Amino acid sequence: MPEILYQEPAAEVESGRGVRRVYLIDPLKDPRWEDLLARSPSASLFHSAAWLEALRRTYGYACTAYTTSAPGEPLENGLPFCRIQSWLTGRRLVSLPFSDHCAPLVEKNGDLRDLVSALQEECRKKRWRYIEMRPLESLEAASQLVRSVATYTLHRLDLRPDLETIFGRFHRDSIQRKIRRAEREGLTYEEGTSESIFENFYRLLVVTRRRHRVPPQPREWFRNLADCFGDALKIRIAWHRNQPVAGMLTIRYRETLVYKYGGSDAQFNNLGGMHLLYWRSIQDAKESGLRVFDLGRSDADQAGLITFKSRWGAAQSKLTYWRLTPSGNSVHIFDPAVRTWRTRVAKKLFSRAPARVLTALGTILYKHIG
């Protein structure tokens, strides 16, 4: 059995039930973490040990979780975080880096309030720049000190109906016809995690990220994801003759298939390569008995992407990120207008950088982004 590393209680908080202690655990070493995930309906792949281990291997983040459960007791709740120590973006706790969402694994509102109170004290004592949480629901009821900093759109497709019904809910012109076009054009499909599949996927990802004028994530990140998730991760490639035209990375967790990364060669987009990959993913998920296809988050200003996902018949919901700061008052509010000039300058530089340079920049920068 792996060694369990316990630290002193992170904090003591006053609540209606008296003084309560909040503890720190290592979710990668404490076997109670997997037991908590198995019992929690809110657990997702972003809570999993595989995701945490990939973050640790790639970026060197220290993973921890806050809980009101004492050592030796069953784990009743948990809030996982990664510690990011960056000279570029500051010292902060994030739950969790590069995750679309990460709901607090807490059933009782009182426990959540106590945990958030302890986090506020931690933020003040240790002078974290901020503590960020990415729940599926609002945290306003847990504390008056949390502030919303960014809003996204999340899409999820219900896979419980039969395939014919699911297909019938796709937008006729934008989705159904594109899938049929891909079939008529003779696009072929390949899946796996072999070296050739990996390299074709990464090449498509780099091309796409450059088109969007942002660096790609490091190669090592995708290799570690594949290693940590094993057979639950699939890379899917659409081919036109001898040319890879679209790629997608999906991860299966429990009854959900999650679309996490994708890329395409723009000169072949009219052939419907990405549409073919989405459709094959849905078919595979149905065959495996999965119930949900998580299409991931979209930025608020990505109107085209939001429309695209909605046309698959996916349900749309609001996703809000929250932060605590040492003062409890000031917070780095997400405001696109404030950062416009920085974003514009950076994207201009990225658009001119050769693919090799852009890839190197991604390897350097993503550790600081979190």
Please describe what each predicted stretch is.
Residues P2-R17, A65, R83, A142-I166, ...:
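Active-site/acyl-donor-binding loops of N-acyltransferases
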Residues R83-T151, H171, R254-S317:
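Acyl-donor binding region in acyl/amide transferases
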Residues Y59-Y61, F81, H101-V106, R113-A118, ...:
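Low-complexity, flexible helical/coil segments
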Residues P31, A43, Y61, W87, ...:
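A generic structural micro-environment signature
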Residues L96, R169-Q176, D335-W341:
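Short intrinsically disordered coil segments
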